[in-house]
A protein has these predicted regions:
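Conserved NAD(P)H cofactor-binding loop of Rossmann-fold oxidoreductase domains
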Residues: 17-19
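Conserved beta-strand termini and adjacent loop/short-helix elements that scaffold enzyme active sites
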Residues: 2-3, 82, 111
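Rossmann-like NAD(P)(H) cofactor-binding subdomain of soluble oxidoreductases
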Residues: 26-93
């Protein structure tokens, strides 16, 4: 339905409406068309559900979320994007395949843009308390060296492109990721998820929406956790933020 009345007094509204991503097209190339859709539907949704938590899912999710925050004028906790929740899950899964350990015991995050400039935070990734860089032998007899980490990061970034090339769209995995986010809100789980809230002085990064580990509960996006970063991670995240901000400015936001 395209009737906003069905969302009246909703607790959570997940917005997936957006331009369709074509094979070979980056998420950022979708920005103009998708933001145009947001400009039409968001004011109507805010009118019927001013207290709802708005979870943006449409790509490019970080830019769309920033524009949505400006369009709605809602408090920063109420508007955030799905971020890299799915990317983080994919990274942990690939680590589990390399090490033979349960995904539940792997702790690590992907931050930044949900897209080509995203940054795996390897320096804080661990398995059962053991830093990934000190893990030792992997199942193939190798070690978790830089080459292996880069391959995992590449596979995570390319996974959506491969799916789009194969069947034309992504739906199941991102649906599960959004389900996890909505569950964290409705059940007030206070769960750490790499959603995309508005950042203000997060490791010196401000005025941009991008994925960082964030405590998510009934009030939406809460505290943004400032994990220790290496100089390289901070530099790459700053570059990712600059790029996202530039795209938003190009759209008039």
């Amino acid at each position: 339905s395209d009737d906003p009345e069905i969302c009246r007094d909703a607790d959570v509204i997940a917005i997936t409406a957006g331009a369709k991503q074509k094979p070979g097209q980056s998420r950022l190339e979708l920005a103009g068309a998708t933001v145009g859709i947001m400009e039409k539907i968001l004011p109507k949704l805010v009118e019927v559900a001013p207290n709802a938590i708005f979870v943006l899912v449409a790509n490019p999710v970080d830019v769309v979320t920033y524009c949505a925050k400006k369009i709605t004028g809602l408090p920063e906790n109420q508007v955030f994007g799905s971020g890299t929740v799915l990317d983080t899950a994919r990274m942990r899964y690939l680590i589990s395949l390399e090490t033979g350990t349960a995904v539940q015991n792997i702790h690590g995050y992907i931050a930044g843009e949900h897209g080509d400039s995203e940054v795996p935070l390897w320096s804080s990734t661990e398995i059962g308390g053991v830093p990934i860089t000190q893990w030792g032998a992997t199942l193939d007899g190798g070690v978790f060296d830089e080459a292996k980490r880069e391959r995992i990061a590449h596979d995570v970034v390319r996974s959506a492109y491969r799916i789009i090339e194969g069947k034309g769209a992504t739906n199941y995995a991102v649906g599960l990721a959004v389900q996890r986010i909505i569950g964290a809100v409705l059940n007030d789980e206070q769960r750490v998820l790499t959603v995309s809230p508005l950042l203000e002085d997060w490791h010196g990064i401000s005025d941009v929406c991008m994925a960082v580990p964030t405590i998510v509960g009934r009030e939406g996006a809460g505290r943004r956790l400032e994990l220790p970063l290496t100089a390289d991670e901070k530099e790459r995240l700053t570059a990712s933020a600059d790029h996202l901000r530039e795209v938003a400015r190009g759209l008039g936001y």
